[in-house]
């Protein structure tokens, strides 16, 4: 996001995401067999703008820490954030961004990733880092440098 995501989402209007998330039923949790599988599923779901697959990874106590002291707590709050992210770009979302890992470091149950994000609507690639905390086959926390207002869009 990867999970870079949420701050970009902060640059998007949240009103429509709240309505969208309320209309969308949270999918059942789907545990992955390994720490790497959790991250691979997250990245693939994010890159494919698959809200259901994203939400199947986050338990009720999920926490996302973003720049500027923004903290998203809980599965329902994350659902609202990601609902905007997966919308097509022409509808105010960021669907179309592809996150590619450039460097990975595992420390215990935390996977630290430096990534590159590119999209047809971006004027230049965007780089960032995320730390993913996994437990029992789920993503329980993420710390991300992703900040949507820093994306340079094509005019």
Predicted segment positions?
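Bacterial N-terminal signal peptides
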Residues: 6-16
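Hydrophobic pocket/interface hotspot
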Residues: 42, 54-55, 62, 74, ...
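Hydrophobic/anchoring residues in structured secondary elements
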Residues: 51, 64, 99-106, 144
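Short beta-strand segments enriched in hydrophobic/aromatic residues
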Residues: 58, 115-119, 145-146
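A short gly/proline-enriched turn/hairpin at secondary-structure junctions
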Residues: 62-73, 88-92
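Surface-exposed, charged secondary-structure patches
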Residues: 79-123
């Amino acid at each position: 996001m990867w999970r870079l995501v949420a701050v970009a989402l902060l640059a998007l209007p949240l009103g429509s995401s709240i309505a969208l998330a309320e209309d969308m039923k949270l999918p059942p949790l789907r545990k992955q067999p390994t720490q790497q599988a959790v991250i691979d599923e997250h990245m693939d779901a994010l890159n494919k703008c698959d809200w259901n697959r994203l939400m199947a990874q986050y338990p009720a106590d999920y926490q996302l820490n973003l720049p500027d002291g923004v903290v998203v707590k809980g599965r329902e709050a994350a659902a609202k954030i990601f609902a905007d992210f997966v919308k097509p770009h022409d509808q105010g979302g960021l669907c179309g961004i592809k996150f590619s890992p450039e460097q990975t470091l595992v420390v215990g149950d935390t996977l630290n990733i430096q990534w590159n994000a590119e999209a047809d609507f971006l004027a230049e690639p965007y780089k960032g880092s995320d730390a993913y905390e996994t437990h029992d086959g789920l993503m329980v926390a993420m710390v991300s440098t992703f900040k949507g207002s820093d994306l340079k869009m094509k005019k």
